[in-house]
Protein backbone atom coordinates (compact mmCIF):
# COMPACT_ATOMS: atom_id res chain seq x y z
CA UNK A 1 0.00 0.00 0.00
CA UNK A 2 1.21 3.49 -0.90
CA UNK A 3 0.72 6.51 1.36
CA UNK A 4 1.44 10.23 1.04
CA UNK A 5 4.51 11.45 2.88
CA UNK A 6 4.08 14.36 5.29
CA UNK A 7 5.66 17.61 4.17
CA UNK A 8 3.83 17.98 0.83
CA UNK A 9 0.66 19.90 0.02
CA UNK A 10 -1.43 20.08 -3.14
CA UNK A 11 -1.97 23.64 -4.35
CA UNK A 12 -3.48 25.11 -7.53
CA UNK A 13 -1.62 28.10 -8.99
CA UNK A 14 -3.37 29.92 -11.85
CA UNK A 15 -5.21 26.76 -12.83
CA UNK A 16 -2.16 24.45 -12.58
CA UNK A 17 -1.92 21.82 -9.79
CA UNK A 18 1.38 21.60 -7.90
CA UNK A 19 2.67 19.37 -5.14
CA UNK A 20 4.73 21.73 -3.00
CA UNK A 21 7.19 20.81 -0.22
CA UNK A 22 7.23 22.47 3.18
CA UNK A 23 9.10 22.10 6.47
CA UNK A 24 11.81 19.44 6.50
CA UNK A 25 11.19 18.64 2.84
CA UNK A 26 12.32 22.18 1.93
CA UNK A 27 15.34 21.77 4.22
CA UNK A 28 16.16 18.57 2.31
CA UNK A 29 15.93 20.59 -0.94
CA UNK A 30 12.95 18.66 -2.29
CA UNK A 31 11.34 20.12 -5.39
CA UNK A 32 7.75 20.80 -6.34
CA UNK A 33 5.93 18.67 -8.90
CA UNK A 34 3.30 19.53 -11.53
CA UNK A 35 0.24 17.24 -11.61
CA UNK A 36 -2.24 16.76 -14.43
CA UNK A 37 -5.90 16.02 -13.73
CA UNK A 38 -5.38 12.26 -13.46
CA UNK A 39 -2.36 12.62 -11.18
CA UNK A 40 -4.28 15.09 -9.02
CA UNK A 41 -7.09 12.56 -8.69
CA UNK A 42 -4.64 9.83 -7.65
CA UNK A 43 -2.93 12.07 -5.08
CA UNK A 44 -6.27 13.01 -3.52
CA UNK A 45 -7.24 9.34 -3.26
CA UNK A 46 -3.94 8.48 -1.57
CA UNK A 47 -4.22 11.41 0.81
CA UNK A 48 -7.86 11.08 1.84
CA UNK A 49 -8.03 7.27 2.00
CA UNK A 50 -4.80 6.91 4.00
CA UNK A 51 -3.25 4.90 1.21
CA UNK A 52 -4.21 2.54 -1.61
CA UNK A 53 -2.90 -0.35 -3.73
CA UNK A 54 -2.01 0.18 -7.44
CA UNK A 55 -4.82 -2.10 -8.70
CA UNK A 56 -7.32 -0.32 -6.47
CA UNK A 57 -6.25 3.03 -7.98
CA UNK A 58 -6.49 1.69 -11.54
CA UNK A 59 -10.02 0.40 -10.91
CA UNK A 60 -11.06 3.75 -9.41
CA UNK A 61 -9.71 5.55 -12.49
CA UNK A 62 -11.68 3.22 -14.77
CA UNK A 63 -14.90 3.93 -12.88
CA UNK A 64 -14.26 7.70 -12.78
CA UNK A 65 -13.58 7.96 -16.52
CA UNK A 66 -16.22 5.34 -17.48
CA UNK A 67 -13.71 2.90 -19.00
CA UNK A 68 -14.42 -0.82 -19.31
CA UNK A 69 -12.32 -3.56 -17.67
CA UNK A 70 -10.20 -4.12 -20.78
CA UNK A 71 -8.47 -0.80 -20.06
CA UNK A 72 -7.42 -1.75 -16.53
CA UNK A 73 -4.05 -3.40 -17.46
CA UNK A 74 -2.95 -0.23 -19.28
CA UNK A 75 -4.23 1.96 -16.44
CA UNK A 76 -2.38 -0.22 -13.93
CA UNK A 77 0.85 0.27 -15.86
CA UNK A 78 0.37 4.05 -15.88
CA UNK A 79 -0.52 4.10 -12.18
CA UNK A 80 2.55 2.02 -11.33
CA UNK A 81 4.80 4.41 -13.26
CA UNK A 82 3.27 7.37 -11.43
CA UNK A 83 3.69 5.74 -8.02
CA UNK A 84 7.29 4.78 -8.80
CA UNK A 85 8.08 8.35 -9.83
CA UNK A 86 6.59 9.83 -6.64
CA UNK A 87 8.29 7.18 -4.49
CA UNK A 88 11.68 7.97 -6.01
CA UNK A 89 11.06 11.66 -5.30
CA UNK A 90 10.10 10.89 -1.69
CA UNK A 91 6.55 12.20 -2.04
CA UNK A 92 4.88 8.92 -1.17
CA UNK A 93 6.01 5.86 0.72
CA UNK A 94 5.17 2.20 0.35
CA UNK A 95 4.07 0.08 3.26
CA UNK A 96 7.09 -1.83 4.54
CA UNK A 97 7.25 -5.32 3.09
CA UNK A 98 9.86 -7.49 1.41
CA UNK A 99 10.96 -6.46 -2.06
CA UNK A 100 13.13 -9.48 -2.84
CA UNK A 101 11.48 -12.77 -3.80
CA UNK A 102 13.78 -15.28 -2.10
CA UNK A 103 15.87 -14.96 1.08
CA UNK A 104 19.65 -14.99 0.77
CA UNK A 105 20.07 -16.78 4.09
CA UNK A 106 17.87 -18.21 6.82
CA UNK A 107 19.07 -18.44 10.39
CA UNK A 108 17.80 -19.47 13.79
CA UNK A 109 19.23 -17.64 16.80
CA UNK A 110 17.90 -18.59 20.25
CA UNK A 111 14.89 -20.16 18.57
CA UNK A 112 14.09 -16.97 16.64
CA UNK A 113 13.72 -17.66 12.90
CA UNK A 114 15.10 -14.91 10.65
CA UNK A 115 14.90 -14.75 6.85
CA UNK A 116 17.49 -12.33 5.47
CA UNK A 117 17.42 -10.75 2.00
CA UNK A 118 20.17 -8.93 0.14
CA UNK A 119 23.76 -9.53 -1.03
CA UNK A 120 25.18 -12.48 0.93
CA UNK A 121 28.61 -10.84 1.11
CA UNK A 122 27.14 -8.13 3.34
CA UNK A 123 26.14 -10.64 6.03
CA UNK A 124 28.86 -11.38 8.57
CA UNK A 125 30.39 -14.85 8.61
CA UNK A 126 29.55 -14.90 12.34
CA UNK A 127 25.98 -15.73 11.31
CA UNK A 128 27.00 -18.92 9.48
CA UNK A 129 26.94 -21.26 12.53
CA UNK A 130 23.30 -20.23 13.00
CA UNK A 131 22.13 -20.93 9.42
CA UNK A 132 19.05 -23.16 9.46
CA UNK A 133 16.20 -24.07 7.15
CA UNK A 134 12.63 -23.59 8.37
CA UNK A 135 9.17 -23.05 6.92
CA UNK A 136 7.94 -19.61 5.95
CA UNK A 137 5.20 -19.88 8.58
CA UNK A 138 7.83 -20.16 11.33
CA UNK A 139 9.49 -16.86 10.40
CA UNK A 140 9.73 -14.38 13.28
CA UNK A 141 11.56 -11.59 11.47
CA UNK A 142 12.41 -10.68 7.89
CA UNK A 143 15.46 -8.49 7.36
CA UNK A 144 16.28 -6.91 4.01
CA UNK A 145 19.35 -4.99 2.88
CA UNK A 146 18.63 -2.41 0.16
CA UNK A 147 21.89 -1.23 -1.42
CA UNK A 148 20.78 2.31 -2.23
CA UNK A 149 19.82 5.45 -0.31
CA UNK A 150 16.20 5.75 0.84
CA UNK A 151 13.89 7.74 -1.44
CA UNK A 152 12.84 10.12 1.33
CA UNK A 153 13.84 11.47 4.72
CA UNK A 154 10.73 11.95 6.83
CA UNK A 155 11.75 10.73 10.24
CA UNK A 156 9.01 11.37 12.81
CA UNK A 157 9.16 11.83 16.59
CA UNK A 158 12.51 11.32 18.33
CA UNK A 159 12.42 8.53 20.94
CA UNK A 160 16.13 8.26 21.68
CA UNK A 161 19.26 10.06 20.53
CA UNK A 162 22.94 9.59 21.35
CA UNK A 163 26.20 9.50 19.44
CA UNK A 164 25.56 5.92 18.28
CA UNK A 165 21.98 6.16 17.02
CA UNK A 166 18.80 8.17 16.72
CA UNK A 167 15.46 6.36 16.90
CA UNK A 168 12.33 7.96 15.45
CA UNK A 169 8.75 6.75 15.80
CA UNK A 170 6.21 6.92 12.97
CA UNK A 171 2.63 5.59 12.91
CA UNK A 172 3.65 2.32 11.23
CA UNK A 173 7.41 2.04 11.82
CA UNK A 174 10.56 3.01 13.63
CA UNK A 175 13.33 4.74 11.68
CA UNK A 176 16.87 4.41 13.00
CA UNK A 177 19.94 6.40 12.01
CA UNK A 178 23.47 5.20 12.80
CA UNK A 179 25.63 8.36 12.48
CA UNK A 180 28.88 6.51 13.27
CA UNK A 181 28.26 3.87 10.58
CA UNK A 182 28.86 5.70 7.33
CA UNK A 183 27.78 2.80 5.10
CA UNK A 184 24.28 2.65 6.63
CA UNK A 185 21.95 5.35 5.35
CA UNK A 186 19.06 4.46 7.66
CA UNK A 187 16.92 1.54 8.75
CA UNK A 188 13.15 1.08 8.92
CA UNK A 189 11.39 -1.47 11.14
CA UNK A 190 7.69 -2.24 11.46
CA UNK A 191 6.32 -1.51 14.92
CA UNK A 192 5.98 -5.25 15.69
CA UNK A 193 9.55 -5.99 14.56
CA UNK A 194 8.45 -8.51 11.92
CA UNK A 195 10.17 -6.71 9.03
CA UNK A 196 13.35 -4.62 8.90
CA UNK A 197 14.73 -2.76 5.90
CA UNK A 198 18.28 -1.42 6.06
CA UNK A 199 19.38 1.04 3.37
CA UNK A 200 23.13 0.64 3.00
CA UNK A 201 26.13 1.04 0.70
CA UNK A 202 26.76 -2.01 -1.52
CA UNK A 203 30.52 -2.21 -0.87
CA UNK A 204 31.36 -5.31 1.19
CA UNK A 205 34.39 -3.80 2.93
CA UNK A 206 35.33 -5.38 6.27
CA UNK A 207 34.18 -2.37 8.30
CA UNK A 208 30.92 -2.12 6.35
CA UNK A 209 30.06 -5.76 7.07
CA UNK A 210 30.97 -5.27 10.73
CA UNK A 211 28.73 -2.19 10.93
CA UNK A 212 25.78 -4.11 9.49
CA UNK A 213 26.40 -7.02 11.86
CA UNK A 214 26.29 -4.63 14.82
CA UNK A 215 23.20 -2.79 13.51
CA UNK A 216 21.29 -6.05 12.96
CA UNK A 217 21.79 -6.83 16.66
CA UNK A 218 19.48 -3.94 17.58
CA UNK A 219 16.61 -5.37 15.53
CA UNK A 220 17.24 -8.90 16.76
CA UNK A 221 17.09 -7.74 20.39
CA UNK A 222 13.80 -5.94 19.64
CA UNK A 223 12.08 -9.09 18.36
CA UNK A 224 13.81 -11.19 21.05
CA UNK A 225 12.30 -8.99 23.76
CA UNK A 226 8.87 -9.56 22.23
CA UNK A 227 9.55 -13.31 22.49
CA UNK A 228 10.51 -13.02 26.17
CA UNK A 229 14.29 -13.03 25.67
CA UNK A 230 16.52 -10.38 27.24
CA UNK A 231 20.19 -9.47 26.73
CA UNK A 232 22.63 -8.77 29.56
CA UNK A 233 26.01 -7.15 28.98
CA UNK A 234 28.21 -9.83 30.51
CA UNK A 235 30.88 -12.45 29.89
CA UNK A 236 29.98 -16.07 30.59
CA UNK A 237 31.60 -19.41 31.31
CA UNK A 238 30.29 -22.95 31.72
CA UNK A 239 30.65 -24.37 35.21
CA UNK A 240 29.01 -27.57 36.43
CA UNK A 241 26.93 -27.65 33.22
CA UNK A 242 25.45 -24.24 33.95
CA UNK A 243 26.10 -20.81 32.46
CA UNK A 244 27.50 -18.29 34.92
CA UNK A 245 27.45 -14.63 33.93
CA UNK A 246 29.96 -12.04 35.11
CA UNK A 247 28.83 -8.47 34.63
CA UNK A 248 30.09 -5.03 35.51
CA UNK A 249 30.54 -1.56 34.14
CA UNK A 250 33.05 -1.04 31.33
CA UNK A 251 36.59 -1.66 32.55
CA UNK A 252 35.41 -3.57 35.62
CA UNK A 253 37.22 -6.73 34.49
CA UNK A 254 34.59 -9.23 33.34
CA UNK A 255 36.88 -10.55 30.57
CA UNK A 256 39.80 -10.73 33.01
CA UNK A 257 37.65 -12.64 35.49
CA UNK A 258 36.37 -15.22 32.99
CA UNK A 259 39.93 -15.65 31.71
CA UNK A 260 40.99 -16.56 35.26
CA UNK A 261 38.23 -19.18 35.44
CA UNK A 262 39.35 -20.58 32.11
CA UNK A 263 43.00 -20.75 33.12
CA UNK A 264 42.60 -21.92 36.74
CA UNK A 265 39.62 -24.26 36.52
CA UNK A 266 39.38 -25.11 32.80
CA UNK A 267 35.91 -23.58 32.54
CA UNK A 268 34.85 -23.26 28.87
CA UNK A 269 34.02 -19.80 27.56
CA UNK A 270 30.47 -19.24 26.33
CA UNK A 271 30.28 -15.57 25.33
CA UNK A 272 32.79 -12.79 25.84
CA UNK A 273 30.42 -9.82 25.97
CA UNK A 274 26.67 -10.47 25.67
CA UNK A 275 24.27 -13.13 26.91
CA UNK A 276 20.64 -13.72 26.00
CA UNK A 277 18.36 -15.07 28.71
CA UNK A 278 14.86 -16.46 28.71
CA UNK A 279 12.57 -18.87 30.50
CA UNK A 280 11.92 -22.34 29.12
CA UNK A 281 9.64 -24.84 30.86
CA UNK A 282 9.94 -22.89 34.09
CA UNK A 283 13.73 -22.79 33.96
CA UNK A 284 15.91 -19.78 33.19
CA UNK A 285 18.18 -20.44 30.22
CA UNK A 286 21.12 -18.75 28.48
CA UNK A 287 21.03 -18.93 24.66
CA UNK A 288 23.92 -18.78 22.23
CA UNK A 289 24.06 -15.70 19.99
CA UNK A 290 26.69 -14.48 17.49
CA UNK A 291 27.20 -11.03 19.04
CA UNK A 292 30.11 -11.03 21.47
CA UNK A 293 31.75 -7.60 21.33
CA UNK A 294 35.35 -7.80 20.14
CA UNK A 295 36.05 -11.02 22.04
CA UNK A 296 35.32 -13.45 19.20
CA UNK A 297 33.91 -15.83 21.85
CA UNK A 298 30.38 -17.17 21.36
CA UNK A 299 28.47 -20.45 21.26
CA UNK A 300 25.44 -21.73 19.37
CA UNK A 301 24.26 -23.85 22.29
CA UNK A 302 21.97 -23.12 25.22
CA UNK A 303 22.52 -23.88 28.90
CA UNK A 304 20.65 -23.50 32.18
CA UNK A 305 21.51 -20.30 34.01
CA UNK A 306 23.58 -20.88 37.13
CA UNK A 307 23.54 -17.29 38.32
CA UNK A 308 24.95 -13.81 37.83
CA UNK A 309 28.03 -12.36 39.51
CA UNK A 310 28.09 -8.57 39.55
CA UNK A 311 31.66 -7.31 39.68
CA UNK A 312 33.01 -4.34 41.62
CA UNK A 313 36.58 -3.14 42.11
CA UNK A 314 38.66 -3.42 45.28
CA UNK A 315 42.40 -2.72 45.11
CA UNK A 316 43.42 -5.12 47.88
CA UNK A 317 40.85 -7.77 48.78
CA UNK A 318 38.32 -10.18 47.28
CA UNK A 319 35.00 -10.54 49.07
CA UNK A 320 31.25 -10.82 48.56
CA UNK A 321 28.86 -8.10 49.64
CA UNK A 322 25.18 -8.75 50.26
CA UNK A 323 22.75 -6.67 48.22
CA UNK A 324 19.21 -5.70 49.16
CA UNK A 325 16.57 -7.54 47.05
CA UNK A 326 15.54 -4.33 45.26
CA UNK A 327 19.18 -3.50 44.54
CA UNK A 328 19.70 -6.91 42.93
CA UNK A 329 16.77 -6.29 40.59
CA UNK A 330 17.90 -2.78 39.74
CA UNK A 331 21.52 -3.75 39.07
CA UNK A 332 20.55 -6.67 36.84
CA UNK A 333 18.18 -4.44 34.85
CA UNK A 334 20.88 -1.78 34.49
CA UNK A 335 23.15 -4.36 32.84
CA UNK A 336 20.50 -5.16 30.21
CA UNK A 337 20.85 -3.81 26.68
CA UNK A 338 17.41 -4.93 25.53
CA UNK A 339 15.41 -1.99 24.13
CA UNK A 340 14.00 0.52 26.62
CA UNK A 341 12.83 3.06 24.04
CA UNK A 342 9.37 3.23 25.59
CA UNK A 343 7.92 2.74 29.08
CA UNK A 344 6.41 -0.63 28.18
CA UNK A 345 9.82 -2.00 27.20
CA UNK A 346 11.37 -0.74 30.43
CA UNK A 347 8.61 -2.51 32.36
CA UNK A 348 9.33 -5.77 30.54
CA UNK A 349 13.05 -5.47 31.32
CA UNK A 350 12.29 -4.74 34.97
CA UNK A 351 9.89 -7.67 35.26
CA UNK A 352 12.44 -10.10 33.84
CA UNK A 353 15.23 -8.73 36.06
CA UNK A 354 12.94 -9.35 39.03
CA UNK A 355 12.34 -12.92 37.85
CA UNK A 356 16.10 -13.50 37.75
CA UNK A 357 16.70 -11.98 41.18
CA UNK A 358 13.83 -13.96 42.73
CA UNK A 359 14.87 -17.36 41.40
CA UNK A 360 18.62 -17.31 40.76
CA UNK A 361 21.75 -16.35 42.73
CA UNK A 362 22.82 -12.76 42.12
CA UNK A 363 26.19 -12.21 43.82
CA UNK A 364 28.09 -8.97 44.25
CA UNK A 365 31.84 -9.60 44.17
CA UNK A 366 34.26 -6.83 45.07
CA UNK A 367 37.59 -8.04 43.80
CA UNK A 368 41.12 -7.54 42.54
CA UNK A 369 42.42 -8.77 39.20
CA UNK A 370 44.33 -11.57 40.93
CA UNK A 371 43.63 -15.34 40.75
CA UNK A 372 42.22 -15.10 44.27
CA UNK A 373 39.21 -13.25 42.82
CA UNK A 374 38.16 -16.26 40.76
CA UNK A 375 38.78 -18.58 43.71
CA UNK A 376 36.56 -16.44 45.95
CA UNK A 377 33.73 -16.53 43.39
CA UNK A 378 34.14 -20.29 42.84
CA UNK A 379 33.99 -21.03 46.58
CA UNK A 380 30.79 -18.99 46.88
CA UNK A 381 29.21 -20.80 43.93
CA UNK A 382 30.26 -24.21 45.28
CA UNK A 383 28.67 -23.36 48.63
CA UNK A 384 25.44 -22.44 46.83
CA UNK A 385 25.48 -25.75 44.96
CA UNK A 386 26.01 -27.65 48.22
CA UNK A 387 22.93 -25.99 49.71
CA UNK A 388 20.69 -27.05 46.81
Predicted feature residues:
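Short capping segments at the starts of secondary-structure elements
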Residues: 45-56
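Hydrophobic positions on the alpha1 helix immediately C-terminal to the Walker A/P-loop
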Residues: 257
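Conserved glycine(s) of the Walker
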Residues: 252-254
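Short, well-structured alpha-helical segments that form the helix of a local strand-helix-strand
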Residues: 57-61
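A noncatalytic interaction/capping subdomain that flanks phosphate/NTP-handling catalytic cores
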Residues: 3-26, 39, 62, 66-76, ...
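A structural micro-motif at secondary-structure boundaries
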Residues: 27-33
Amino acid sequence: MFKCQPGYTLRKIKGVSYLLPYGQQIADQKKGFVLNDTSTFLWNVLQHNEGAEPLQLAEMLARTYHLDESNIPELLSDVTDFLTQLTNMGMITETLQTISREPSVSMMIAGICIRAYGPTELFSSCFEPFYREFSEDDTDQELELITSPPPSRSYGQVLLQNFEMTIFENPDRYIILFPQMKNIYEAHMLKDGSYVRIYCHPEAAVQNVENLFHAIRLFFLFIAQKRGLFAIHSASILYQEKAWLFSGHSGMGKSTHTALWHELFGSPYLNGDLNLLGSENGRLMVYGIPWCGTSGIFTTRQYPLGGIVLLGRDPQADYLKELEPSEKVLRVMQRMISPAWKERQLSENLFFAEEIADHMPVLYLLCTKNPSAALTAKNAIDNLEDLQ
